[in-house]
Design a protein with these regions (language model features):
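Extracellular/oxidizing-compartment recognition motifs
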Residues: 1-356, 364-365, 379-390, 396-409
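Well-ordered alpha-helical segments within folded domains of soluble proteins
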Residues: 363-374, 383-384, 415-423
Length: 423
């Protein structure tokens, strides 16, 4: 099925937001919705691109288990959309679509050394949607869509997410919801790159680990180093707050240590999520548009609130295991297990050097790990998609940067990095 070929679907954003400069204010996450009819749900598909990240709902149900979609690309050269089959989500008759957007890599609003803060493509989040079957055009994104702000009051890829449950939009995913107070979406400029379907393995939540409180500093331990985020179950009064800070190590006194990890972030929080309670019984929350590298979480409570459980949610590309190794040496078996977990922790759509400090896809690091990775996992589609970004980031002179995707930083790493294109 061919999508977006006639250019009638429009990139849309929130009315009243204008990105003037790199110092433009960080805005709450936009929430979009649209009621639409569908005569026959069979064979209906959606193509969606929400930059930087999106979460999609049809008739109140989240579509797919994917997270952190779409995977980052060189947005001024190539933009990925994702296709989902909606046959099992749609009704014959009235339906409603809901989409939440996060900043992701598209709007890296915190100053850092890799120049994404100054990326040529950087702008406020935007959305492109097309729903159709082989025989029927059903829905396109345009100014008839409704948009507002909601409980995600802040999100930053390397910072974290802030969620105020008192601002939740109860019932917004129902066709009958009254959205008359919402504004109409506005047409926004395209991000610059041409549209192409995402083919890499998606990121998903691949496991859940109960974290245990280990000391008087309210530090919780996952028992292993992971990539992902925390999910909390809390109860308390409206306005009480929980602040979650993430780290891989502890100081000798048992407090979190982010030494050497946060020094390249020049403003704002680092690996910190914040939740404000609505005061309505038991509340369960986890962030949508960020991820962290950690083993330990410091959970600080302000106000009348009690944390009943804190769980670590493992996030990585959902790569199928295709190889294994075992032997009579427990040390080597343990090393193999650590290697596999470390590899997955550093594959969130792109092969990264670390899941906390940078999250960047260093070409030299990736070319050293690719053989080990392909022995263990079916990563061919994901590497192929990433290699497309090499072409997009390459200068007319032939120069390649050390990290890809790239916002114009570090085009002089040398052969050990450049050779990743060939090996």
């Amino acid at each position: 099925m061919n999508f977006f070929s006639d250019h009638r679907s429009k990139w849309i954003g929130r009315n009243g937001e204008t990105f003037h400069s790199v110092d433009s204010p960080v805005l709450p996450a936009p929430y979009f919705r649209k009621v639409f009819p569908c005569a026959n749900p069979a064979g209906v598909k959606i193509a969606i691109c929400g930059l930087g990240y999106y979460e999609l709902f049809i008739n109140g149900r989240k579509v797919s288990e994917n997270v952190l979609d779409p995977i980052v690309s060189q947005y001024d050269r190539r933009v990925r959309y994702v296709v989902h089959d909606l046959s099992d989500y749609l009704n014959a008759g009235e339906n409603v679509i809901g989409v939440i957007l996060g900043n992701g890599w598209y709007n890296c609003h915190t100053p850092e050394v890799w120049n994404f803060y100054h990326a040529a493509w950087r702008d406020y989040p935007r959305l492109l949607v097309e729903i159709k079957s082989e025989n029927e055009e059903i829905l396109r994104s345009n100014t008839s869509w409704k948009v507002t702000e909601g409980p995600i009051v802040f999100d930053g890829l390397r910072n974290g997410e802030h969620y105020d449950a008192r601002l939740e939009l109860g019932g917004w995913l129902s066709p009958a919801y009254d959205d008359s107070a919402w504004g109409n979406a506005k047409i926004t400029a395209p991000p610059g790159g041409f549209l192409e379907a995402q083919t890499a393995a998606p990121c998903r939540i691949t496991g859940t680990v109960e974290m245990k409180k280990i000391n008087m500093f309210d530090v919780y331990d996952a028992g292993m180093n992971i990539t992902g985020h925390a999910r909390i179950t809390v109860e308390g009064k409206a306005g009480a707050k929980v602040t979650l800070r993430y780290a891989e190590r502890l100081t000798a006194d048992g407090e979190l240590s982010t030494y050497s990890q946060d020094k390249f972030i020049k403003g704002g929080d680092f690996q910190t999520d914040r939740y404000t309670l609505k005061g309505d019984g038991i509340e369960v929350w986890e962030p949508r548009f960020t991820y962290h590298g950690f083993q330990y979480v410091h959970a600080a409570v302000t106000g009348d609130c009690k944390i009943s459980t804190l769980e670590a949610r493992l996030v990585s590309s959902d790569l199928k295991s295709v190889g294994s190794f075992t032997c009579s040496s427990e040390m080597l078996n343990r090393l193999q297990d650590c290697t596999r977990r470390s590899y997955l922790s550093n594959f969130t759509g792109i092969p990264t050097d670390c899941p906390h400090r940078e999250k960047n896809a260093w070409t030299g690091d990736a070319q050293l790990a690719v053989e080990t990775g392909l022995f263990n996992f079916d990563g061919a589609r994901s590497y192929k998609q990433w290699i497309d970004s090499f072409r997009d980031a390459q200068r007319p002179s032939g120069q390649l940067p050390g990290i890809i995707p790239n916002a114009g930083w570090n085009y002089h790493c040398g052969p050990a990095w450049d050779c990743a294109l060939f090996v």
